[in-house]
């Protein structure tokens, strides 16, 4: 069962300019430590760093839309973090107000699953989020059979 869908498209140069202007203040306010570490591993090319941050920014916007709140109602930037599963597939980890909102949307006996697609083609980055509720037993079976 689909709980929410969100998408976002952003100009990578906009994120690059914000990073240039506000630096650490912006990065600390918006991105998790894991997201920052991922971007910094790409530091040899400033375009790659900006694109990495832009994709994650778009993912947070898309996720907040899928939650039905936007960045308000207790859902903040750092409550949503992009992580990669062992096979490399991106997903999101929610904490704080975002996790509280997700839990409120998830029906009893179900587990929330967040599917994320992120991409970039200079100068644009895009993210698409689908939040689904799946039976808790099915989620357990997936984790035990992997």
From Swiss-Prot:
Give the catalytic activity.
apo-[ACP] + CoA = holo-[ACP] + adenosine 3',5'-bisphosphate + H(+)
Please indicate which superkingdom the organism of origin belongs to: Bacteria
* KW Lipid metabolism (keyword) present: yes
Q: Where does Mg(2+) bind?
A: 8, 61
What does the record give as EC number? 2.7.8.7
MF (Gene Ontology): holo-[acyl-carrier-protein] synthase activity; magnesium ion binding
Q: What cellular component GO annotations does this protein have? A: cytoplasm
Q: List the disulfide bonds.
A: none
Q: Which UniProt keywords apply?
A: Cytoplasm, Fatty acid biosynthesis, Fatty acid metabolism, Lipid biosynthesis, Lipid metabolism, Magnesium, Metal-binding, Transferase
Q: Which InterPro entries match?
A: 4-PPantetheinyl_Trfase_dom, 4-PPantetheinyl_Trfase_dom_sf, ACPS, Ppantetheine-prot_Trfase_dom
By what name is this protein known?
Holo-[acyl-carrier-protein] synthase
Q: Which organism is it from?
A: Rhodopseudomonas palustris (strain ATCC BAA-98 / CGA009)
Protein's gene:
acpS
């Amino acid at each position: 069962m689909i709980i929410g869908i969100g998408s976002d498209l952003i100009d990578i140069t906009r994120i690059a300019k914000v990073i240039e202007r506000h630096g650490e203040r912006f990065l600390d306010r918006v991105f998790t430590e894991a997201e920052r570490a991922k971007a910094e591993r790409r530091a040899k090319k400033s375009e790659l760093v900006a694109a990495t941050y832009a994709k994650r920014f778009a993912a947070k916007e898309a996720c907040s839309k899928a939650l039905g709140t936007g960045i308000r109602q207790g859902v903040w930037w750092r409550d949503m973090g992009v992580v990669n599963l062992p096979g490399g597939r991106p997903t999101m980890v929610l904490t704080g107000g975002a996790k509280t909102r997700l839990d409120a949307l998830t029906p009893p006996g179900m587990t929330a699953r967040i599917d994320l697609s992120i991409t970039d083609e200079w100068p644009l980055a895009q993210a698409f989020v689908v939040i689904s509720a799946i039976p808790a037993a099915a989620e357990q079976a997936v984790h035990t059979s992997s």
